[in-house]
UniProtKB/Swiss-Prot annotation:
Keyword match S-adenosyl-L-methionine: yes
Top EC class, one word: transferase
Localization per record: Cytoplasm
UniProt name for this protein: Ribosomal protein L11 methyltransferase
Entry function: Methylates ribosomal protein L11.
Reaction catalysed by this enzyme: L-lysyl-[protein] + 3 S-adenosyl-L-methionine = N(6),N(6),N(6)-trimethyl-L-lysyl-[protein] + 3 S-adenosyl-L-homocysteine + 3 H(+)
Keywords: Cytoplasm, Methyltransferase, S-adenosyl-L-methionine, Transferase
SUPFAM superfamilies: S-adenosyl-L-methionine-dependent methyltransferases (SSF53335)
Organism per entry: Vibrio cholerae serotype O1 (strain ATCC 39541 / Classical Ogawa 395 / O395)
Name of the gene this protein is made from: prmA
UniProt keyword Cytoplasm present: yes
UniProt GO BP: methylation
Taxonomic classification: Bacteria, Pseudomonadati, Pseudomonadota, Gammaproteobacteria, Vibrionales
Pfam family, one: PrmA
Length: 295
């Protein structure tokens, strides 16, 4: 069965209210918030909805709904400016989960490392293969920030080292580190769902005994590592710089991503006094900052 989709542009201030209006007053069967400009979203305050500054509100309706009436109702709500921009289109009903699975293919990072969906055959059984089922947590390797961190890990000699994955998400970086030779990896994340996804993916790869995961409040005191990787966002990387630097042994190596190229210098400033920084690596407007801790 086809559906009608209406897309409206909103701001962080009114997107949630517009979504509520579309559900309650116009008969939408679902409302989705999308990033309108491919910009990062920062952690919300407690009780806030996590949204972008420029947000597309996308409503889905049954095919027999009168779109002209829906647009009149939206106009009558006075929640959008006169002559508001909108896009109406018909979308075909699909098995969206199956389509996503069909389009998620094995990917190579660096010389040795492959990330493979758990439902596909590995292309090179002799390579370092991470089998991944992302579940509800971020991190599949398709985003440039994840790719930058995976390539960095592939280029290191991790044999026998301890690694901290700060903001572990799906566990993709933690598992890759183990597969690349690390003796032990500690994953830290503020989201309990991420810890569950990391555990599940670690078990799928047979490395669950080498990976520990913690909420920040539960992590062991005095925790330090030879290598720290933090694929989060520029804001937290600045705000948490004392914590992140404190996790690194003297001479240890750090990589950070989740940073737009326009934010790189402002993040680097928080680490330059304590680390010998490498040249910034860039991919599709995102970047990686890495270096070695002095001392």
């Amino acid at each position: 069965m086809p559906w009608i989709q209406i897309k409206l542009n909103a701001t962080n201030d009114n997107a949630e209210a517009i979504g509520d209006m579309l559900m309650e007053e116009t008969g939408a069967v679902s409302v989705t918030f999308l990033d309108a400009k491919d910009t990062p979203v920062f952690e919300p305050l407690p009780g806030e909805t996590r949204l972008w500054g420029d947000t597309d509100v996308v409503a889905l309706y049954e095919a027999d709904m009168d779109t002209s009436l829906i647009l009149q109702q939206i106009k009558a709500s006075n929640m959008l400016a006169e002559g508001f921009a909108h896009k109406v289109e018909q979308v075909e009903d699909k098995d969206w989960e199956r389509e996503w699975m069909d389009n998620f293919h094995p990917m190579q990072f660096g010389r040795r490392l492959w990330i493979c969906p758990s439902w596909r055959e590995v292309p090179d059984p002799q390579a370092v293969n991470v089998m991944l089922d992302p579940g509800l947590a971020f991190g599949t390797g398709t985003h440039p920030t994840t790719a930058l961190c995976l390539e960095w890990l592939d280029n290191l000699d991790l044999t026998g080292k301890t690694v901290i994955d700060f903001g572990c998400g799906s566990g993709i970086l933690a598992i890759a580190a183990i597969k690349l030779g690390a003796a032990k990896v500690i994953g830290i994340d503020i989201d309990p769902q991420a810890l569950l996804a990391s555990k599940d993916n670690a078990a799928r790869n047979g490395v669950e005994d080498q990976i520990e995961v913690y909420l920040p409040k539960d992590q062991p005191e005095g925790l330090v590592a030879d290598v720290v990787v933090a694929n989060i966002l520029a804001g937290p990387l600045r705000e948490l710089s004392p914590t992140i630097k404190g996790l690194l042994k003297p001479g240890g190596q750090l990589a950070m991503s989740g940073i737009l190229d326009t934010q790189a210098e402002s993040v680097a400033e928080f680490y330059r006094d304590d680390l010998e920084l490498d040249p910034i690596a860039e991919k599709s407007e995102w970047c990686r900052i890495s270096g070695r801790k002095l001392g």
